[in-house]
Amino acid sequence: MVAPNDAHLQYFGRWDKSNAQEYQCAQGAVYIKANFTGTSIKAKLRDPNDKWRVSIDGGAFQKIKPRGNETVLAENLKPGTHKLLFVRSTEGYMGTTQFRGFELDDGARLEAPDPLKTRRLEFVGDSITAGAKNDGELKGENYNDIEDNDQAYGPKVSRMLDA
């Protein structure tokens, strides 16, 4: 088990780290980066309503909805070192996520994190800034299914400027 306060984990955005065993977040587009060995990784989350996206080794994002005590983020990977990017997609009104760490394969471990970028940007706004309805058409009650904070203009501009 990798605890939330492991020094090899990198957190971005607003995280409440007052409890070393359970970090919390409530805003969209917060994320975690980690480099790990092994063939799989699971997240220990308590989060009934939110949606997340995961990218392994810079690949395409996969949509994730937390399930139970452990949510599979990736499995059947080639043995070796991998890069994880784990991003919350839904806005703050959906509630708070409790993150309790990651589960890795037996014998697997976290590796040293990548160097932090020197530029930082901050965007303040409303649901447009948060990526509301930017991932599909609103049809009834699918609001959260068509929201992706990581594809809002703030994160996109940050990536374009290498911030």
Where are these regions (language model features)?
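N-terminal secretory targeting modules
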Residues: 1-124, 128-149
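Phosphate-binding active sites in nucleotide-utilizing proteins
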Residues: 141, 146, 156, 161-162
